[in-house]
Swiss-Prot record:
InterPro entries: DUF3217, NA-bd_OB-fold. It comes from Mycoplasma genitalium (strain ATCC 33530 / DSM 19775 / NCTC 10195 / G37) (Mycoplasmoides genitalium). This is Uncharacterized protein MG376. The lineage of its organism: Bacteria, Bacillati, Mycoplasmatota, Mycoplasmoidales, Mycoplasmoidaceae.
Length: 104
């Protein structure tokens, strides 16, 4: 599936959307490339019951692993198409995730 993503990182910040319909999480990933260190930030969200589970999880743990899908939307203010990540599944700590890259 082309729009499927797996993300893992340190929880940087969390907040509810202004209408309280979705829960947003910002994570931080650090990576090394040679002697240089890079820090990347990703924001993802969940709606409905998964939003409440995501909130409870972020209060309990400092790191998170998720499976999500890319969603494209038109931002009303700027008129620019943007991409966001919607959480499909929260990976529990110490769970073994096997990713099969073979196309079927």
């Amino acid at each position: 599936m082309l729009n499927c993503v797996f993300l893992e990182g340190e929880i940087e910040s969390t907040k509810w959307s202004h209408k309280k319909t979705g829960f947003l999480v910002t994570i931080k990933q650090k990576r090394l490339f040679g002697e240089r260190s890079f820090t990347d930030f990703f924001v993802f969200y969940a709606n409905g019951q998964l939003a409440f589970e995501l909130e409870a999880y972020t209060q309990k743990f400092k790191t998170i692993s998720i499976e999500g899908i890319l969603r494209t939307y038109l931002e009303k203010r700027s008129g620019i198409w943007k991409t966001t990540i919607e959480v499909v599944k929260i990976m529990k700590p110490n769970s073994k995730v096997m990713i099969d890259y073979q196309e079927s």
